[in-house]
Amino acid sequence: MAQAKMQHPVSWVIFAGMAALLLFQGVPVRSGDATFPKAMDNVTVRQGESATLRCSVDNRVTRVAWLNRSSILYAGNDKWCLDPRVVLLANTKTQYSIQIHDVDVYDEGPYTCSVQTDNHPKTSRVHLIVQVSPKITETSSDISINEGGNVSLTCIATGRPDPTITWRHISPKAVGFISEDEYLEITGITREQSGEYECSASNDVAAPVVQRVKVTVNYPPYISDAKSTGVPVGQKGILMCEASAVPSADFQWYKDDKRLAEGQKGLKVENKAFFSRLTFFNVSEQDYGNYTCVASNQLGNTNASMILYEETTTALTPWKGPGAVHDGNSGAWRRGSCAWLLALPLAQLARQF
């Protein structure tokens, strides 16, 4: 801290010089010395807060000062430093205190309360500890890698005390932390390990800070669903082909080694990220047969075969049970009314009563 250039009484200058000399020579006051007033223990504050340094005195003290290392901050009521953040808080018969506002890391270190009593200057020291919230200063960029490759992720953070860094995989299947280090190494990465990885830095000074890195794992297509389908002639038919791949697969359809093009009469090919749909609007005899779905990306290709076959409808057998009525005009049988069958037994029951 800068020193103020001002005139001070000679006695103060001599006292301050002796205090600085004692400080430089490392002359401490014993903790068990009950005859000498003591400064407080270590003071811990967070960056940006105010630190109060207190020194207990009594009526035997004739002069008192606060020093930071070899720089005099206050001597009595006189301010010796130019730092506007340092103010005198109390100068009484029992206490001599200063306060430092908006504390920063460079304020950390030893502070000394120096007193003059019985013509002998003595000192008592307090250490100011400045805590700093964690801050992530460097992380890996999002990465894209082929399945089976090795991945190294970095997360560098600062803070006081030094923050603890942890890595975890943001995935429903992930359990707990996968690393408690600045570096996360993944050997032979699989497609299940793709997704976001979160770096967290914490030191209990403030809430943890987090940053995420996206890891994309590329792999060749894998067809997960391709089923044969039966459709009657003249009906609408659909063949589906589902495939997983990163990057997304391109789909192609073939019938008997002949590629089917989009817009071909009576057909529609609809390709999405993870599936392809081949639609027949009016199935004919010529449409039946073997079809092949081919899924491909930069890493490879795969195919699956399926059959579009004719599905025949089974005619319902005409009803010829009790109450069936034959239509003489059409020759068809239909279910007739059964009311006349119930009339006779009901009439017989009525006569008995």
UniProtKB/Swiss-Prot annotation:
Disulfide bonds join C55-C113, C155-C199, C241-C293. Found on the dendrites, somata and axons of developing Purkinje cells. Undetectable on other neurons like Golgi or granule cells. Interacts with NEGR1. It is found in: Cell membrane. Residues 37-124, 134-216, 220-314 form the Ig-like C2-type domain. GO terms for biological process: cell adhesion. Keywords: Cell adhesion, Cell membrane, Disulfide bond, Glycoprotein, GPI-anchor, Immunoglobulin domain, Lipoprotein, Membrane, Repeat, Signal. Pfam families: I-set, ig, Ig_3. One of its GO terms (cellular component) is side of membrane. Belongs to the immunoglobulin superfamily. IgLON family. A lipid is attached at S330 (GPI-anchor amidated serine). Residues 331-353 form a propeptide. It is a lipid-anchor; GPI-anchor. This is Protein CEPU-1. It may be a cellular address molecule specific to Purkinje cells. It may represent a receptor or a subunit of a receptor complex. Glycans are attached at N42, N68, N150, N282, N290, N303. Residues 1-28 form the signal peptide.
